[in-house]
Amino acid sequence: MNHARRKLVKFSLGSLAATALPAWSVSIRAQQPTVSIIDAGGSNVVVCDTADGLVLVDSGTPTYASTLVDQLRAVGNGRVHTLFNTHWHHDNCGANELIGDSGAAIVAHQKTWQRLATQYYVPHEQRYVEPLPETARPTVKFAGKGSLQVGAETIDYGALVLPHTDGDIYVHFRNANVLVVGGAVTPPELDPELDWYGGGWLGGRAQSLDTLLALADDATLIVPAAGRTLTKAELSTERDMTHELYQRLNKLIRSGCSATCMADEGALEGLGRRWQDPQRFLYAAYKGLWAHHYNLAPDIL
């Protein structure tokens, strides 16, 4: 983000329109009457204001943690009621510790709790990521579905099947009609991120996009972990592209194709998408497909 040109944005949430609110030093991506989507260092943070406190989905990058939390204190009653983590990558959990220290509940997939509580390796960066402090880790863990009522807002949430990592979830603000999808969805301007070492793979992404599409209607605001918001029509296009790509790569890997071979065979052509780093994406997709070879075909080996 260009700090020199970043625009300071004032915004209001629902009934707080008459209340003095801070000039945010993070950009507002989109707003609904009770929900704002904030770009906190390249990572989207969703803020829902209710009479019982704020509900957040993800907490931005560590660099923006203090700024984000300081400015949240000026919204509504200034208290974070609940924080959801859509997955365990640290660039989406940056303010977890500060928010957890304030007494907020942190809700996440069981696998996210496990990942945040232990050291894990990032192969493409050749480094280990240390566990987060205990107060930064989820206090409510699940592996299926759940629902939460905070103020007047009904919030449904559920696990997704390995679209990005092994700990992905969605969060659906039913009344506001905002569906937060984390790393399971990527706007077409960005390449899909498949953390193959962390469990994410293309088949899981295709299945998860089916799940998410069934939750949305034509008015739903769909919020990924990074980048702009999407419509249901755009999500449908992403789903169709992902299923087509899965079929192509499945066929190629069964024929003995490597990631480089997939590129040479034009696996990414004609999909209506401009790829930023096609070789990197194909490598991650290839590794993920091999990790899940038992789901491809009985003769894969």
Residue ranges and their predicted role:
Residues 31-71, 171-173, 177-183:
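Conserved beta-strand hairpin/beta-sheet module of binuclear metal-dependent hydrolase folds
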Residues 63-107:
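Active-site metal-binding motif and surrounding structural segment of the metallo-beta-lactamase
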Residues 57-59, 81-89, 107-110, 180-182, ...:
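Active-site neighborhood of phospho(di)ester-bond hydrolases with catalytic His/Asp-centered motifs
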Residues 1-19:
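N-terminal secretory signal peptides and thylakoid transit peptides that target proteins
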Residues 15-16, 20, 25, 213-221, ...:
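Accessory terminal helices/loops
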Residues 53-54, 61-62, 113-160, 165-166, 174-175, 209, ...:
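Metallo-beta-lactamase
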